[in-house]
Amino acid sequence: MKVLVACSLPESTLQELRSLGTEVLYEPELTAERMEDLVRDVAVLVVRRTRVSPEVIAAGKALQLIVRAGTDIANIALEEASAQGIFVANCPHTDAIAIAELTFGLLLALDRGVLESAAALKKGVLQEPEVGEARGLAGRTLGVLGFGPVEQEIVKRAHAFDINVLAWSPALTPELAAASHVRFCAWPRELARESDMVTVYTPQQEADEVLVDAEFLQNMRDGAYIVYVGHPAAVDEAALAEIARERHLRVAYDISAPHLATSNAGRFKSRLQALPKAIGTYRLADRTEQSYEATTDELLRVIREFLIAGRVVNCVNLLERSPATWQLVLRLKDTVGVLASVMGQIRADGINVEEISSQVFTGAQAGFCTIALDERPSTEALSAIRELDGVLHLELRALV
């Protein structure tokens, strides 16, 4: 079995893959254009940010699994992979700690004027800050928009800094908030009003909703801090640039959008660059050795489970619930041809099988099988299955 690795991985990880009995094609500089040629007889494809196009999917006749070394799967033609019966898996949240650490680094830099002081000292200028320019984080209130793995890592660090934490998320309940020692907010604007600092993290696949709009910003306290990491589409940049000046907000951001606005000279441009004391960085969020190692460990786990157990962990393109409306529940003799005969009767009845599951009992004499169907079998088909040699029992259940 061939594994094509189209991203940088340590030699130890490549050796682990080879120890699973695979032939590893290591092409860390592989482009999307060349991938189409190399993927033809590959069973497993590993990528980081390289585009996996519909053409690559079509060319991968032997392709069974695509693994994204990271969380964001926007670079993979998911619909086409699903149509060809190819599993797509990722390594979710292995970057959560790294993103939380950067978020706090940006908060501290905003509060203490780290960049300004470092720049002045580099020029030989001893620039002593005014008393009160840095407020300190202890005892302040942090509003966390969202409550996924990244935000929960931010909360852990906030508590270590003796910061009061508020949180809002569509999925957050008062009970979960209490268990996490944060105060529940029913609405984003409530969080904005009550916070001295606000953090926002938005991965690429969730960037279709603006979380920080003009209304949210107008509700923030004068002089508050806002740090956002991830895709910039989650923040109304024009509103932030305008309101930050009016309300003296301090802004820091790390952006990771694949296509960013540039000037005619090819340089990045943003309304936020002109804001006093604004801090902007590009794709620092997950770039730590700890995050890299966590991702490679998870990548190995995904491929190992697939090769050894036939199970795809972290799969992102399976239906949570199949379109099946009926289920056959059978006890069968564990002998050659019994299940095949059952399937033959289902086919003869013109019914499609959506899912099938089978288990064998101790002694390997009998098995238990469930077959999910897209419509109800005819009475004649059920009778024919019951009469098959090796069928011990049959029950038909409606799926609701």
Model-flagged regions — what are they?
Residues 313-400:
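A conserved regulatory-domain signal marking ACT and ACT-like small-molecule sensing domains
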Residues 1-91, 213, 355-356, 360-366, ...:
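An N-terminal-biased, well-structured beta-alpha scaffold segment characteristic
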Residues 147-148:
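Glycine-rich Rossmann-fold phosphate-binding loop(s) that bind the pyrophosphate
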Residues 84-86, 92-141, 153-156, 167, ...:
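Phosphate-binding beta-alpha-beta segment of Rossmann-like dinucleotide-binding domains, i.e.
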Residues 88, 222-324, 332-333, 368, ...:
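Rossmann-like dinucleotide-binding domain for NAD(H)/NADP(H)
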Residues 52-58, 171-268, 287, 399:
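Rossmann-like adenosine-cofactor binding region
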Residues 63, 138-141, 223:
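Phosphate-coordination loops involved in phosphoryl transfer and adenosine-cofactor binding
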Residues 100-119, 156-163, 297-310, 343-352:
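Oxidoreductase and adenylate-handling cofactor-binding alpha/beta cores
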